[in-house]
């Protein structure tokens, strides 16, 4: 997948915790540097080096969007770091030296960060704590991946009828929402009915004819677990470049028609794999979005 800064910047939890860790480490290393060498625990130096390596590792894993593949490894490494920082705090906090106290304050902050990461990376994706943290990033990160004006292959035309309204009973306001290529954002309500589609639903010309809607193939779209057929819309063909295996079962939220449900070990076709939400297609042709921490890319 390659390193992409968007993977890191699209996750508020990653930005806030890594930034907090860097600041806490700077406080600790500044205190250590200003302390007298004969009055400073030497093993604390190794603890600080170990801690910055952990922060860099988490940052790189977020950049590569592979944090979920190594979260159990991180829990073990962070547990060791938690012991280092708490032990250093105990050795420094009772000192009267200002440098030692500054380093102790930094170690306390690093201990708090290590504990938070242990709880998050060690928790199940469906746990209340993880879902609460992920809720701040999931929806916003997927909105940034929606089609924009520069994705010409995703644009399509909704035909108008002779009376001036769109074919298949689409209103003027609805048509302007669906075909507006100047906006880089579309809300989930604007995407209703457009999420799930099959390759047979688009003619080779890239537009939909409205002269004989009864003869057009039905479009299959998501109803959160129940596939229904509707001929109101035809949508563009999307290429799914990757395959992924479901690590856990997932039930689509009834409040978001864009989500799809799937079961553990199911093979999905996915695309737009930046951020927390990926575009996915099931074997039955159902298309929508899935949380990236529930699936694993296959080679």
Swiss-Prot record:
Q: Quick check: keyword Transcription in the entry?
A: no
How this chain sits in the membrane, per its record, is: Multi-pass membrane protein
Q: Which residues form the SH3 domain?
A: 239-299
Instruction: Give me the Gene Ontology terms describing cellular component.
Output: plasma membrane
Function of this protein? Plasma membrane osmosensor that activates the high osmolarity glycerol (HOG) MAPK signaling pathway in response to high osmolarity.
Q: How does it assemble?
A: Forms homooligomers.
The family this protein is said to belong to:
Belongs to the SHO1 family.
Q: What is this protein called?
A: High osmolarity signaling protein SHO1
> Lineage of this protein's species?
Eukaryota, Fungi, Dikarya, Ascomycota, Saccharomycotina
What gene is this protein a product of?
Answer: SHO1
């Amino acid at each position: 997948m390659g390193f992409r800064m968007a993977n890191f910047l699209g996750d508020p939890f990653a930005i806030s915790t890594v930034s907090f860790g860097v600041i806490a480490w700077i406080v600790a290393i500044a205190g250590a540097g200003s302390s007298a060498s004969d009055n400073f625990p030497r093993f604390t130096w190794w603890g600080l080096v170990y801690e910055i390596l952990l922060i860099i590792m988490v940052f790189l894993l977020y950049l590569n969007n592979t944090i979920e593949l190594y979260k159990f490894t991180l829990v073990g490494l962070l547990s060791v770091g938690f012991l280092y920082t708490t032990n250093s705090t105990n050795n420094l906090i009772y000192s009267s030296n200002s440098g030692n106290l500054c380093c102790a304050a930094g170690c306390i902050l690093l201990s708090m960060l290590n504990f938070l990461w242990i709880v998050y990376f060690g928790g199940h994706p469906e746990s209340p704590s993880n879902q609460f943290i992920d809720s701040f990033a999931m929806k916003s990160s997927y909105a940034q991946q929606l089609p924009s004006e520069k994705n010409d292959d995703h644009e399509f035309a909704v035909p108008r009828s002779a009376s001036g309204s769109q074919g298949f009973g689409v209103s003027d306001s609805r048509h302007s929402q669906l075909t507006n290529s100047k906006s880089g954002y579309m809300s989930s309500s604007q995407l209703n009915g457009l999420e799930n589609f099959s390759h047979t639903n688009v003619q080779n010309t890239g537009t939909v004819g409205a002269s004989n809607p009864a003869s057009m193939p039905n479009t299959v779209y998501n109803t959160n677990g129940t596939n229904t057929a509707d001929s109101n819309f035809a949508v563009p063909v999307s290429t799914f470049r990757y395959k992924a295996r479901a690590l856990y079962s997932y039930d689509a939220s009834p409040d978001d028609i864009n989500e799809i449900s799937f079961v553990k070990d199911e093979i999905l076709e996915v695309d737009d794999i930046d951020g927390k939400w990926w575009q996915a297609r099931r074997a039955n042709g159902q298309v929508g979005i899935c949380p990236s921490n529930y699936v694993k890319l296959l080679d």
